[in-house]
Amino acid sequence: MRYIYTRELKYELLEVERLFRTALAPWSSEVDCYLVRLNNDSTWQHLPGIVLSAYHFMGLDKSFSIAMANIFKNLYFAQSIHSWVRDDEEGQEYNQDLQFSILIGDYIFGHVLKLLVDIQATSLLQDFLPMICTINEGNVLKHKFAISEIEVLQKTRVPLYSTAFITAGKLARLSPERLKIYGQLGYNLGMAIELLENNHDQEADQYIHDSISLYEEFS
């Protein structure tokens, strides 16, 4: 599914991609195999634009919004790399590829921390850490307990969207009541996008309706 972005947002997305690629340039040949795996990944495609939109709607600085979109892009990349590492029961081979997967994933997490320091936003770690824990829990449930596809999306994808809205709302100093609404908007929007992208159109209808209602309530 294609989403229509304004011309300005398209330019900002290009800048996010430039920042992302520049940081990984020393390992470009090594990480290409991971990036190829994300070519058709719906979250990979849509998350940066959603983050930018969430931050712009709060009236936050453009350069800061771009930096945050890059941070979320890096977080999702690192989480994806780590999620592809299997355990012994799943036939994981202990070789250089495994070592690099772990190292590059850890490096990117460290890079995210540096980016937060650079923009003086380390306070957001209190929101990122629970998000990462939820995603990790979702990956474990996915591989060990065979939960439904929708439950997997709720645990491993949607927390990125809701956290984007919550962090934007906190930085904009929303009241607790309005912050809760804005976070719910991010959650429902994320569920709608991910369900539509994974051909769960009927299940997405309620989340689309709730997103519209929350947007109207917030506005």
Protein language model features and the residues they cover:
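All-alpha prenyltransferase/terpene-synthase fold signal
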Residues: 1-219
